[in-house]
Amino acid sequence: NTKNIKVENVILQSGQLVTNYTIPAGSMIIPNRQPEAPLIAAILEFDADIDTDVLVEERQKSLKSGSSIMYDTTAFNFTMMYGLDAVTVGEHLDSSLEIWKQSSVSSEVIKDAVIWATNGTDDNSVAFAARLMEQNIEVRIIDKESTLSGHTLPRGSVAVLQMDNPDISNLQNLVKTVSDELNISVVSIESGFGPEELPDWGGRHFRLLEKPQIAMLSHEGFNSYDVGVSWWSLDHHLGIRHSMINASLASYGDLRRYNTIIIPSGRAIDDYTVDTLLDWVSQGGTLIAHNRSTRFLTSEYGIGSVKQLQNTFDESEKYNFDLLREIYSQYENIDKDKTNNNIIDFEVSYPWEELDGTLSESELKSRDKWQSIFMPSGSIVAGRIDDEHWLTFGTPNTIPVLYSNLPILMARSYVDAPVRIGQMIPNNEINEPRIINWSSLPAGNDLNVRMSGLVWPEASQRIANSAYLTRERIGDGQVILFSGEPNFRGATLGTNRLWLNAIVYGPGLGTRSRINP
């Protein structure tokens, strides 16, 4: 569409019905009034209706024997799998539209520029940074939106500075070559000073990256699907060098040549390998794990302080306290008169004082045992992001997450949780806070968990407010845990972006020192 289009009764990916909505100019409009309507519906409809008879049989089998008639996914649509914002419009649109044509990307790589930069919302920006660092070019990333020389650069934008690379005479040509390979737009910036309070090129928001030196554990004991799609993603989306290490030999090899190690979903790791990895992480390494490997690393034999839900009920109040800090940190309503009053306020309210009916440890265990019976099979749930964290560069505020019977991660305040399950939706009709198992939801909010597929109400309650992605500093390094498999079948491009951020940006943004060869 060439202009903004105002429409009515639009369905969001969250399932909300919005009475009045404006489709921004430049959106892709796919009409369903055409011969391929059945195919379009099959690949783009947000939700597929499951027959009541099927739901009855599935629930009965789950309760009776713990079995299921579902395959490994009960949800699929392109926009959610790809992490794209989309809406369903219930009316035919025909004004301000033109036939879509693939547009060529234009780059202005001017020799005398002080900075060359690319937009961080483009997933190819991660590969742009990776391929330049592969050629030993110093690269920076902007962690807060700025405007330089009239160009708006959102957080996550990649910048190459002339002054960082004084000895590279053909820097301009290298930038141009990589941008052409990736078909990504690059802008040339003549001044590094942001207007007013926006970041400048010499400030703390222009952070220097570290060249990733990547290894992935594989071979016996690992899920071949997860190994394969992770390997493919490294090749296809980044196109830089990496090593495959036989996990049985990891404890005998020299890991110092790597600063990033990926552990795909797999079996438990022996004690000696765990000790080797812990020592490597403490020296500045970035360890990234998926699904079953995450399940092991969050056990009593693993690494770090992230725990699984079933092991936290004796400290549920502490976890809820930290969660409330996180939620209330997003609030913008301040009573300025009370704040500036010199007299002490005797009516200050605290989040936990308003709660009624908190659950005991025994009740939490009983509920969890029951709710665990109904965990989903490949459904899509809503992930809310921390929009200030570097792991969420280039992602929407609500990221669709493919979820099944995964380890449910619990993080205290000293562990980052860049993605949690559940989209906060304002609802002014809710006047009191509500309890969801171990956690609580402040007044004035609803929580949307399900986006697509079969998610029983019990499962929604069980996974609500848990972490899908965590990042914890250990020594000089860090451990990054994905509850699921971020590259499922190479199709979940939304969560794949989180994974690529972890690999390429982790060594520079999340660690304190280098792994020295």
Model-identified regions with their sequence ranges:
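Intrinsic-disorder/low-complexity accessory segments
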Residues: 1-517
